[in-house]
């Protein structure tokens, strides 16, 4: 709430600029911003450095406030710092506001739907994780409340958890509130791998929100989606509602306010809501969303946020105990990689992922509780892509497939690992029925007949003899295997599975 003193609007910080927060460290430059009287000299002091600016002349709201913002020099010393902002009021007096216990580190946005919202208390080994949280005072956490708006808003409409130092209390909040398990575990693992570098984690998720609600309508339209469509959006505690896709309801409230803040990167766990909604457009909408977020952050922070900031995601897991089921999850996993099969790739730069289709849990839930494995895989790829660390971060990736017409075998060569860990013989299928292969019943298993270093040889079934091979696929099932029993893993890090694969000849 704004405050008036004898007719004066007093300065305040934007509502997510708080005590205990994390600001982006050097080499990037952080931004501090807030509201106050229009056209007033505003001074910021941090340690022995003083900055000045003039608040904007134009009003931002009906409260008579305008925006002020100050760009700090790059700060590599983690702190903690106290920050003081002083503004001259209309009556000539000075008014000072302060931030305390501010650290400088890497700021990560954690977004998506309910699998990102799923709290530490909801996962396996929650008690141990929560009890140990106090060992990480240099990790700071913040959770946004799920709100909607027709138009972009500068400030958050609701906050579930103010900036907090990691502790059993701040990490062990109620179910599906705070702290996001994937966000926390990813941040903790990055923090430990980077020798205790301070990490700020902003959890801003909206359960059941399709990807179309996370970007503006013109971007959705670029992918050939009609803006007359509506999306079912269940909001906890309220009747189920339909919202129009022509409004970026969730982006406006959950992401846009942070685009004035300099960040290091983003992680994303979403896709289930698109399992039956514009699934065929997901490769386009996902790529466009990443591009739009990056452009918006870069523009609104005056080029201080990297135009290609790292973007990590969790590839969809499982939900069924039926090993033969093939639903929209199978093709959506492929679309999550922009139809390449793996990331990083050349379609969208600096993107990384965690493969999770082997982490089967409760067959009736979309929310697997093995979030430690999810975060481990995501943090390994984050270290490699976002931090340029020389770590193994993915399972075997297909580099080439060789097949000659009339042959009874297919050779698949992999890259990125020293050797391949074969856990069983199930997972590959082929289709020899030409263009009719869109029918899943026409695909038949192909067995591994030999392995030589990084090359696997498949023997085709008798139904393919004398016919041309049309398609090859791997792990093309909603739930392709028991827990951690997919066919292919890295031999040197056996918690890194090979992702699903699809090829047409």
Please report, for each region that a protein language model flagged, where it lies by residue.
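Cell-envelope and extracellular/periplasmic
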Residues: 2-505
């Amino acid at each position: 709430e704004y405050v008036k003193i004898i007719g004066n609007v007093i300065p305040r910080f934007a509502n997510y600029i708080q005590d205990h927060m994390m600001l982006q460290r050097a080499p990037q430059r952080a931004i501090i911003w807030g509201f106050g009287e229009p056209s007033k000299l505003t001074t910021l002091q941090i340690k022995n450095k003083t900055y000045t600016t003039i608040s904007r002349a134009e009003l931002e709201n009906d409260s008579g406030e305008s925006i002020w913002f100050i760009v700090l020099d790059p700060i590599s010393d983690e702190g903690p710092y106290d920050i003081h902002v002083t503004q001259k009021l209309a009556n000539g007096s000075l008014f000072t506001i302060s931030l305390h216990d501010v650290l400088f580190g890497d700021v990560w946005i954690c977004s998506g739907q309910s699998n990102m919202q799923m709290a530490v208390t909801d996962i396996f080994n929650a008690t141990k994780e929560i009890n140990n949280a106090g060992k990480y005072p240099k990790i700071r956490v913040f959770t946004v409340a799920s709100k909607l708006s027709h138009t972009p808003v500068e400030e958050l409409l609701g906050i579930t958890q103010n900036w907090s130092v990691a502790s059993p209390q701040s990490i062990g909040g109620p179910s599906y509130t705070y702290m996001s398990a994937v966000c926390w575990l990813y941040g903790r693992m990055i923090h430990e791998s980077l020798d205790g570098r301070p990490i700020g984690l902003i959890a801003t998720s909206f359960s059941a929100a399709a990807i179309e609600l996370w970007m503006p309508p013109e971007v959705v339209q670029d992918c050939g989606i009609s803006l007359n469509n509506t999306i079912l959006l269940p909001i906890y505690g309220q009747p189920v509602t339909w919202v129009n896709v022509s409004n970026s309801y969730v982006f406006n409230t959950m992401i846009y306010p942070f685009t004035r803040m300099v960040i290091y990167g983003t992680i994303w766990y979403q896709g289930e809501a698109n399992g039956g909604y514009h699934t065929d457009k997901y490769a386009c909408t996902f790529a466009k969303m990443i591009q739009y977020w990056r452009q918006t952050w870069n523009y609104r922070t005056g080029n201080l946020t990297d135009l290609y900031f790292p973007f990590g995601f969790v590839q969809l897991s499982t939900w069924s105990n039926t090993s033969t089921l093939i639903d929209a999850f199978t093709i959506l996993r492929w679309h999550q990689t922009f139809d390449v099969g793996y990331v990083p790739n050349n379609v969208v730069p600096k993107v990384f992922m965690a493969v999770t289709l082997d982490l089967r849990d409760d067959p009736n839930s979309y929310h697997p509780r093995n979030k430690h494995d999810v975060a481990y895989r995501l943090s390994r790829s984050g270290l490699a892509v976002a931090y340029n660390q020389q770590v193994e971060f993915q399972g075997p990736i297909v580099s080439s497939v060789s097949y000659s017409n009339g042959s009874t075998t297919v050779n698949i060569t992999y890259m990125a690992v020293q050797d391949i860990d074969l856990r069983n013989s199930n997972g590959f299928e082929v289709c020899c029925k030409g263009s009719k292969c869109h029918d899943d019943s026409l695909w038949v298993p192909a067995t591994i007949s030999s392995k030589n270093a990084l090359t696997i040889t498949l023997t085709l079934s008798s139904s393919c003899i004398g016919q041309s091979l049309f398609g090859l696929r791997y792990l093309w099932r909603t739930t392709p295997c028991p827990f951690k029993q997919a066919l292919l893993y890295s031999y040197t890090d056996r918690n890194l599975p090979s992702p699903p694969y699809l090829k047409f000849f």
